[in-house]
């Protein structure tokens, strides 16, 4: 029972950090500002996280757990190649849209000037997502005996770039241009092009 308040305080700190990333676009978040937002001293912050980098790692862990667990569900439950790709990309866009502050972490904007390890970890997350897309596209040729005219790795990179671009627009517009806006129409076009290849 004694560990419960610590977990709640840690979660509260991470929620405040995400909120500050959303409400202060383009601004660097200092531990002093975060402590004031949380309503504790900087020393109290450091009792829960040894460094600001660890706070960002906490957000990145949340991102990884949220996205990768849902991607695994998509991989298990959906067998149609195009639906899998659409659902994976839509998951990424909806997640960013519902978590504007965290979309700055996904985009790398909030990590400028922070520890290189954080940017590397986000890069690794996107590499994992791209690997899932490659797997989905490769499985099409195994299941149907017919692949695409373009290498699956090139296609996976293109699909992920579309999602990353939408997230970048969302961050750049200070969260006004929703990443999911026009996605269904754009996906219909992309799907037609993929199926023709």
Curated annotation (Swiss-Prot):
Q: What keywords were assigned to this record? A: Cell cycle, Cell division, Coiled coil, Cytoplasm, DNA-binding
The UniProt entry, under Pfam families, shows:
SlmA-like_C, TetR_N
Domain HTH tetR-type, chain residue ranges per copy: 7-67
User: What biological-process terms (Gene Ontology) are attached?
Assistant: cell division; negative regulation of division septum assembly
GO CC terms, sorted? bacterial nucleoid; cytoplasm
Q: Where are the transmembrane segments?
A: none
Residues of the DNA-binding region: 30-49
The residue stretches assigned to a coiled coil in this entry are 109-136
Superkingdom of origin? Bacteria
MF terms (GO), sorted A to Z: sequence-specific DNA binding
Name its cellular compartments. Answer: Cytoplasm, Nucleoid
Q: What does this protein do?
A: Required for nucleoid occlusion (NO) phenomenon, which prevents Z-ring formation and cell division over the nucleoid. Acts as a DNA-associated cell division inhibitor that binds simultaneously chromosomal DNA and FtsZ, and disrupts the assembly of FtsZ polymers. SlmA-DNA-binding sequences (SBS) are dispersed on non-Ter regions of the chromosome, preventing FtsZ polymerization at these regions.
What the record says about family reads: Belongs to the nucleoid occlusion factor SlmA family.
Q: Can you state the subunit structure given in the record?
A: Homodimer. Interacts with FtsZ.
Q: What is this protein called?
A: Nucleoid occlusion factor SlmA
């Amino acid at each position: 029972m004694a560990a419960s308040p610590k977990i709640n305080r840690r979660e509260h700190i991470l929620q405040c950090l995400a909120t500050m990333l959303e409400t202060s676009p383009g601004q660097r978040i200092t531990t002093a500002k975060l402590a004031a937002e949380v309503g504790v001293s900087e020393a109290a912050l450091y009792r829960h996280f040894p460094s600001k980098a660890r706070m960002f790692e906490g957000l990145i862990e949340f991102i990884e757990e949220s996205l990768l667990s849902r991607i695994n569900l998509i991989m298990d439950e959906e067998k149609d190649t195009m639906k899998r790709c659409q659902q994976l990309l839509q998951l990424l866009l909806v997640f960013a849209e519902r978590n504007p502050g965290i979309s700055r972490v996904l985009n790398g904007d909030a990590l400028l000037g922070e520890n290189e390890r954080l940017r590397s970890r986000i890069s690794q997350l996107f590499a994992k997502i791209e690997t899932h897309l490659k797997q989905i596209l490769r499985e099409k040729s195994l299941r149907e005996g017919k692949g695409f005219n373009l290498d699956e790795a090139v296609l996976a990179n293109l699909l992920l770039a579309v999602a990353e671009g939408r997230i970048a627009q969302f961050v750049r517009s200070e969260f006004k241009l929703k990443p999911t806006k026009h996605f269904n129409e754009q996906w219909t076009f992309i799907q037609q092009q993929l199926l023709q290849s």
